[in-house]
Amino acid sequence: MSATQNYGTGRRKTATARVFLRPGTGKISINNRSLEQFFGRETARMVVRQPLELTETVEKFDIYVTVIGGGVSGQAGAIRHGITRALIEYDETFRSSLRHAGYVTRDAREVERKKVGLRKARKRPQYSKR
């Protein structure tokens, strides 16, 4: 891998994002679409930008992302995790501020499986005493 780009893998729920940071002007490309085209919701866009705003590197990098799996929220979280890891690879001094904000830790919460005899993961059929 060349020294002109930094790489980070991010995961959240069932989504996986591969993130490449290259020196640039702040353009974010996700699956060959712009951030605005890819995410309709402003909250998802905000989540993606959080690590860049925290480290004040919004206009410093062009970001290229490939994301697969999951839904809107999971993909946004995976991209944030990937950007965080790539920023740490670029400059290790970012780690403490990113860790304090909670972006370095992989959110391990996954969907709980549905159990036999139950309607959902934990929802039980109505109990009848008589």
Curated annotation (Swiss-Prot):
Keywords: Ribonucleoprotein, Ribosomal protein. One of its GO terms (molecular function) is structural constituent of ribosome. One of its GO terms (cellular component) is cytosolic small ribosomal subunit. The keyword Zinc-finger does not apply. One of its GO terms (biological process) is translation. Signal peptide: none annotated. Pfam families: Ribosomal_S9. PANTHER family: RIBOSOMAL PROTEIN S9 (PTHR21569), SMALL RIBOSOMAL SUBUNIT PROTEIN US9M (PTHR21569:SF1). Belongs to the universal ribosomal protein uS9 family. HAMAP family: Ribosomal_uS9_B. This is Small ribosomal subunit protein uS9. The gene is rpsI.
